[in-house]
Amino acid sequence: MALNLRKNHPLLKTINDSLIDLPTPSNISIWWNFGSLLGICLMVQIITGLLLATHYTADTSLAFSSVAHMCRNVQFGWLIRNLHANGASLFFICIYLHIGRGFYYGSYLNKETWNIGVILLLTLMATAFVGYVLPWGQMSFWGATVITNLFSAIPYIGQTLVEWAWGGFSVDNPTLTRFFALHFLLPFVITGLTLVHLTFLHETGSNNPLGIPSDCDKIPFHPYYSIKDILGFALMLITLATLALFSPNLLGDPENFTPANPLATPPHIKPEWYFLFAYAILRSIPNKLGGVLALAASVLILFLIPLLHTSKQRSMTFRPLSQILFWILVTNLLILTWVGSQPVEHPFIIIGQLASFSYFMIILVLFPIAGVLENKLLNP
């Protein structure tokens, strides 16, 4: 009994089945590393966030000063803050690569796992948004004002909804305190959803680059992939440390070093880089409600991807037309990200509109057509 505690103990057995004796396809590549990297990101963010929360004051008159005090007077406070701010960027880099992997290799056909994953993405976006408001700089304040204001586009109940979310008639102290409460709560919701995500994944087992069943050729997760994952951890943590120590403000907005002032609007309000693609889609539609719907659709479209799969093959490994479309889509998203960071003037408006149209066109129309064409090419 003592020798096999790992396999018999009710709690250790679950951990063993998920991380040690888990049967894993023998041919999964480094692209399958991002799930565990996201787990590390979540742990880093919760630990650094908890340490920051012990010194932070969620009050409009003190929030900005409390963050400044943390960086100046708290032991290694500057490092904890920089790790937390840049950890969010790495979190989004990993999740976008993880989703891209799922899209390329057809992992979305594990529908339950995929749908929980999309809900995880939405929760992460909500967490990052409310977190960005907490330092109470100019971009925090105006970002919160602009994005929460979008809910007023909802017919009939919009304005009431926005004032209810604000806790008043503008973004003010009640907004900041509730955003802090939400920012503290949501990472634990993400942790819970992650466990559900893993539970669904382990029902079917991992997909692999060929997109074919791999039951006949499975290897234990430990030591093979536990060792392989450590390489990913090292690379990611080195990247995070480099970013936090050498250029901590590279991905931030200089406007946020100015305390929030409701009487002075920044010349160019924009979110953090990881929301720019959605922001560009929002801005490319002149109508407020239309823009909000397009913004929501840009992320919610992920729920439709399993339904739009027309190919007889699961993975894109042997589907050249879909591969070309996939990389066009990636480029398109990079263009949207760039356009979102630019001012609203001549060339950028039309580029944003074309890129937004192509984004929906590629996913909703061209991918299903390419799948049907590739089926025809298989059986001419």
Swiss-Prot record:
Membrane-topology descriptor: Multi-pass membrane protein
Q: Which cysteines are joined by disulfide bonds?
A: none
Membrane spanning residue stretches: 34-54, 78-99, 114-134, 179-199, 227-247, 289-309, 321-341, 348-368
Where is heme b b562 annotated to bind? 84, 183
Protein family membership: Belongs to the cytochrome b family.
SUBUNIT field: The cytochrome bc1 complex contains 11 subunits: 3 respiratory subunits (MT-CYB, CYC1 and UQCRFS1), 2 core proteins (UQCRC1 and UQCRC2) and 6 low-molecular weight proteins (UQCRH/QCR6, UQCRB/QCR7, UQCRQ/QCR8, UQCR10/QCR9, UQCR11/QCR10 and a cleavage product of UQCRFS1). This cytochrome bc1 complex then forms a dimer.
PANTHER family assigned to the protein according to its UniProt record, in alphabetical order: CYTOCHROME B (PTHR19271:SF16)
**What is the recorded function of this protein according to its Swiss-Prot or TrEMBL entry?**
Component of the ubiquinol-cytochrome c reductase complex (complex III or cytochrome b-c1 complex) that is part of the mitochondrial respiratory chain. The b-c1 complex mediates electron transfer from ubiquinol to cytochrome c. Contributes to the generation of a proton gradient across the mitochondrial membrane that is then used for ATP synthesis.
Record's protein name? Cytochrome b
Name its species. Drepanornis albertisi
Q: What is the lineage of its organism?
A: Eukaryota, Metazoa, Chordata, Craniata, Vertebrata
